[in-house]
Amino acid sequence: MSFTIQTVTFTAPQPLGALPDSRGRFGRFGGQYVPETLMSALAQLEAAFNQYRHDPQFLAEFAGHLRDFVGRPTPLYFAERLTAHWGGGRIFLKREDLNHTGAHKINNALGQALLALRMGKRRIIAETGAGQHGVATATVCARFGLECIIYMGVHDIERQKLNVYRMKLLGAEVRPVAAGTGTLKDATSEAIRDWVTHVETTHYILGSAAGPHPYPLMVREFQAVIGRETRVQCLERLGRLPDVLIACVGGGSNAIGLFHDFLDERAVRLVGIEAAGEGIETGKHAATLTAGRAGVLHGAMSYVLQDEQGQVQEAHSLSAGLDYPGVGPEHSYLKDIGRAEYYSVTDSEALAALSLVCSTEGIIPALETAHAFAYLGILASQLHSEQIVVLNCSGRGDKDMGTVARAMGWGKEE
C-alpha cells in the first residue's frame, strides 16, 4: 500500500493528483483560515502526516488494520438487475457499505487514529452528522484505548438515534450541540472550539475532506484506497478503466476517495451528486456546488451557501450526512476547472431511488448514497450498453430506517 500521488495524463498546469500546493491550496481554494492558537497544531499535524505518509512501518500497520479490522478490499459488485432496469451502461457498485461500521468513514478514522498515537495525542474529538463518522471514530478509539468525544447536532441526534446508541456503546461521550440548526455545521464549529481549548492534548479527527490544510489532503489520502482498489478491480475483472465514476457529495470524502486515482485519466468522467433537498428554487437544499459561491467556512476557502452579505445560510437535506452548507476545497477546484461534474437531486428523488435499489438488488443504501443512485437513473439513459459506471456505495441504510419510515408514512395509526 502506498500514499504516492498519481500523476499522468490530464492536461492542466500541473498534474491534478499533485495538488494541493505547498500552501495547502487547490487553485484559489483551501488554505488555513483559523485562530492563531491552532496554527502550531496544524503545523505539527502536517509535519507528522508528511513524516509517516511514506513510512513503511506506518503504511504496513495501516494496511494491516484495513485488511483485518475493516475488511478491505471491498467488493466491486455488478448490479445486474439495476443495469437491466435502466437499460444504459453496465453498473458496478464499490461496496463501501460492507466495511466494518457500515461506511467509508472508517478508512479515514483509522488512519488519523494511528497518526494521533504517533503524535502522543490520546484525547480524540470528532464531529458527526449522519453518525457514521462518529461511530467510526468511536470504534477506532475503542480499538486503541483512546478517549473519545463526539459532537453532534441535536436535530441529527433525533434522526440518527441508532448511531448515537452505537457510539455510546463503544465508549464515546456524545455531546449534543443545540446552536444554530443543530446539524453538522454546528457540530463542526463546536468541535473546533474544543480543539482550540485543548490543542496540546487533543487530536481532532475531521471526518470530511474539508477544513484547514492539511485535513483535505490527509482525509483524501486515507480515503484514496477506494479509488486504488477500484482501478485494480476494473482492470483485473473488466480489462479496462470505467467510463464514469459517481458518488454523493456532502463535504466530499467518499467522492474524492473514489475520484483521486482517476483525476489525471481524462477519459474517465467524474460525477458528484449533492442534495437538492426540497428543491433548489425553494432555498431549502444543500447543493453547495450548484448554488453556492466562494467563501470561507471551517478554516478553508471553498464553495459555501451564503446570502448577499456573505452570511452562511442554513442547509437542508433529508440526509443528515449531506446537510452541510460547505464542501471540500478540492471539489470546489475540480468544479471550477471542469474536471468533475456536479448535479443535485431532491429528497423525494433520493427516497424513490432508495426504494428501487432495495427492491431490485437487495441492498439498503444510506440516504446519502441514495442521492447518487437517483442521478444514476438519469445518467444511465445517456450511456450505451458497453459503457462502465462505478457508483460508490458509500454506506448502508440501517441508520436511516426511522427517517425513511416517517417519510414513507409507515407506522401511522389508521
From Swiss-Prot:
It catalyses: (1S,2R)-1-C-(indol-3-yl)glycerol 3-phosphate + L-serine = D-glyceraldehyde 3-phosphate + L-tryptophan + H2O. Signal peptide: none annotated. One of its GO terms (biological process) is L-tryptophan biosynthetic process. It is an enzyme of class 4 (lyase). One of its GO terms (molecular function) is tryptophan synthase activity. Transmembrane segments: none annotated. It comes from the Bacteria. Pathway: Amino-acid biosynthesis; L-tryptophan biosynthesis; L-tryptophan from chorismate: step 5/5. Its cofactor is pyridoxal 5'-phosphate. Pfam families: PALP. One of its GO terms (cellular component) is cytoplasm. CDD domains: Trp-synth_B. The keyword Thylakoid does not apply. Its EC number is 4.2.1.20. Belongs to the TrpB family. The beta subunit is responsible for the synthesis of L-tryptophan from indole and L-serine. Tetramer of two alpha and two beta chains. This is Tryptophan synthase beta chain. It comes from Gloeobacter violaceus (strain ATCC 29082 / PCC 7421).
